[in-house]
Swiss-Prot record:
One of its GO terms (biological process) is protein quality control for misfolded or incompletely synthesized proteins. It comes from Alcanivorax borkumensis (strain ATCC 700651 / DSM 11573 / NCIMB 13689 / SK2). The lineage of its organism: Bacteria, Pseudomonadati, Pseudomonadota, Gammaproteobacteria, Oceanospirillales. It catalyses: Hydrolysis of proteins to small peptides in the presence of ATP and magnesium. alpha-casein is the usual test substrate. In the absence of ATP, only oligopeptides shorter than five residues are hydrolyzed (such as succinyl-Leu-Tyr-|-NHMec, and Leu-Tyr-Leu-|-Tyr-Trp, in which cleavage of the -Tyr-|-Leu- and -Tyr-|-Trp bonds also occurs). Belongs to the peptidase S14 family. This is ATP-dependent Clp protease proteolytic subunit.
Length: 205
């Protein structure tokens, strides 16, 4: 039996779930409780600390049960490519399928990770928004160093477009065109593009 405790005057605090067990009461923050149900949240900017936590949670859930799906809920404006790629590589590396769900928005690296979910298990809620574009970068310094970084960004752009083509089924030429500038999509448009497999208005029975 679970009870959700939340003080509405302290909205910055994470809600705590109190569970009644045979050994007495146990308390979990809401995210830890959902982790027991194999649910991981990717909320906010994609950066190293967040990525490390998500990778650790996926590895833990794999060790708990390598044959049961992991559910990754995404509401993110994007962020660091290298941090995002650590999540992506782990999703592909572990044995359980990772089902992805966009709630709110999945932009840039958020959209990339959304479409990286297991085939047939990539979803969005009806009013979610998705945005794809080319990687952003900025660097100051000597001209030779700027040139090195520009070449690196072009390599990353090619790598991301190639992976997006693999997961969406879009031709690489079309992806290069579509990611040249910010490209916003509704949930239905993201489904048509191949970023997700279905738009869910209600939880499947």
């Amino acid at each position: 039996m679970s009870q959700l405790i939340k003080d509405p005057t302290n909205l910055g605090l994470v809600p705590v779930v109190i569970e009644q067990t045979a050994r007495g009461e146990r308390s979990f923050d809401i995210y830890s409780r959902l982790l027991k149900e194999r649910v991981i949240f990717m909320i906010g900017q994609v950066e190293d600390h967040m990525a490390n936590l998500i990778v650790a949670q996926m590895l833990f859930l794999e060790s708990e049960n390598p044959d049961k799906d992991i559910h990754l809920y995404i509401n993110s404006p994007g962020g660091s490519v290298t941090a995002g790629m650590s999540i992506y590589d782990t999703m592909q590396f572990i044995k359980p399928d990772v089902s992805t769900m966009c709630i709110g928005q999945a932009a840039s690296m958020g959209a990339f990770l959304l479409t990286a979910g297991a085939a047939g298990k990539r979803f969005a809620l009806p009013n979610a928004r998705v945005m794809i574009h080319q990687p952003l970068g900025g660097f100051q310094g000597q001209a030779s160093d700027i040139e090195i970084h520009a070449k690196e960004i072009l390599k990353i752009k090619g790598q991301l477009n190639s992976l997006l083509a693999h997961h969406t089924g879009q031709p690489i030429e079309q992806l290069e065109k579509d990611t040249d500038r910010d490209n916003f999509m509704s949930a239905d448009e993201a489904k048509e593009y191949g970023i997700i497999d279905a738009v869910l208005s209600q939880r499947p029975v």
